[in-house]
Curated annotation (Swiss-Prot):
Belongs to the thiolase-like superfamily. Thiolase family. One of its GO terms (biological process) is fatty acid beta-oxidation. It comes from Psychrobacter arcticus (strain DSM 17307 / VKM B-2377 / 273-4). SUPFAM superfamilies: Thiolase-like. The gene is fadA. Its EC number is 2.3.1.16. This is 3-ketoacyl-CoA thiolase. It catalyses: an acyl-CoA + acetyl-CoA = a 3-oxoacyl-CoA + CoA.
Length: 390
């Protein structure tokens, strides 16, 4: 049994929305901040703690404009009814934003700068497009290839470098959908998804509790017919082997072990180590490899010690390349066991906390003790978190 020290950072709870399609999806009439506020309220309702104890609300969001602008982290706290005494901030590490929110809160707890944090992330890619308002510096091309801004082309590069075939990618994508739909029908997402009101295709109000991007009817024959999405001449990456544009939010309740004990709350896991790392922007999908190597070293562990793993799965070529580099190709039965972003969607600022919440639930369902959540990040970064159930 793990003995916790007072300043250990523990995860008390974690929730998420279902993931909606960006194009005419179920959240097309729901704002990003409203969706997030629903999750914050759910954490307060599910756990017996005084929200006046919250030090800060830390929210990950990539495109911080329109409804996601003006410090959405603070707006979410106010919308959710969290006392005004709690702070609110918004962080941006592109796809790793909400995992960075977790790391920021953890570092503050470790250094005595607060005991209770609500962290999370959101991206409504239907309302705020990924490139909305972006004005890149022309001089950037002196330092990295312009194609590095095109995520699909970076996946093509990784696939070529690691000899990942089209057939392997199609099989990987199909398996993601199969696992995600099995997890859905077997109720394995029930503990993490908070129902949020949205609209069906006809515009009728509905409670959204099922990830909309999953294709339960996907077949290998369908996938093989698709043309390359990013390199029409010699490419292997298709829409079916890329994570879908989607809308969603995620949230976690983080405390010091001492505070959780004082409140009589049972922690579900503690954070063992955290890391970020950079890599060449042209192969940004490789980022989880150096980030994970750092996190493992800080935890005094090896990749063989990881019993359950969540990898963001931006593209099949990217995921397979990372698995190859981390010597996990033959251990895919412990990676994304409930499906990954190819099936579930990848709302940018939401994804880091989402995969950590999904990891925790998967560990509880599989009765494993040590887990790794890791992600690639645009322009060449990776971020990793190792957690241990307590």
């Amino acid at each position: 049994m793990t003995i916790l020290s007072p300043k250990d950072v523990v995860i008390v709870d974690g929730v998420r929305s279902a993931m909606g399609k960006t194009k005419n999806g179920m959240f097309r009439h729901v704002r990003a901040d409203s969706m997030s506020a629903e999750l914050v309220r759910a954490l307060v309702e599910r756990n017996d703690f005084d929200p006046r104890d919250v030090e800060d609300i830390i929210w990950g969001c990539v495109n911080q404009t329109l409804e996601q602008g003006l410090n959405i982290g603070r707006n979410i706290g106010l919308l959710a009814g969290i006392p005004k005494t709690a702070g609110g901030q918004t962080v941006n590490r592109l796809c790793g934003s909400s995992m960075q929110a977790l790391h920021t809160a953890a570092a503050q707890i470790m250094t005595g700068q607060g005991d209770v944090f609500i962290i999370g992330g959101v991206e409504h890619m239907g309302h705020v497009g990924m490139m909305h308002g972006i004005d890149l510096n022309p001089e950037a091309s002196k330092h990295y290839a312009k194609a590095s801004n095109m995520m699909g082309l970076t996946a093509e590069m990784l696939g070529r470098m690691n000899n990942i075939t089209r057939e392997e990618q199609d099989a990987f994508g199909l398996e993601s959908h199969r696992r995600a739909w099995a997890a859905t029908t077997e109720g394995r997402f029930d503990n993490e998804i908070i129902g949020i009101e949205g609209h069906d295709a006809a515009g009728r109000l509905q409670l959204c509790t099922v990830d909309e991007v999953i294709r339960p009817d996907a077949t290998m024959e369908q996938m093989q017919k698709l043309r390359p999405a990013f390199d029409p001449v010699s490419g292997t990456v298709t829409a079916a082997t890329s994570s879908a544009l989607s809308d969603g939010a995620s949230a976690m309740l983080i405390m010091s072990a001492q505070k959780a004990k004082e409140l009589g709350l049972k922690p579900r896991a503690r954070i063992r180590s955290m890391a970020v790392a950079g890599c060449d922007a042209a192969i940004m999908g490789y980022g989880p490899v150096p980030a994970t190597q750092k996190a493992l070293k800080r935890a005094g562990m090896s990749i063989e010690d990881m019993q359950t793993i969540e990898l963001n799965e931006a593209f099949a070529a990217q995921g397979l390349s990372v698995l190859k580099a981390l010597n996990l190709t033959d251990k895919q039965d412990i990676v994304n066991i409930n499906g990954g972003a190819i099936a579930l969607g990848h709302p940018l600022g939401c994804s880091g906390a989402r995969i950590t919440v999904t990891l925790l639930n998967a560990m509880e369902q599989s009765d494993t003790e040590i887990g790794l959540a890791t992600m690639c990040i645009g322009l060449g970064q990776g971020i990793s978190t190792i957690i241990e159930r307590v």
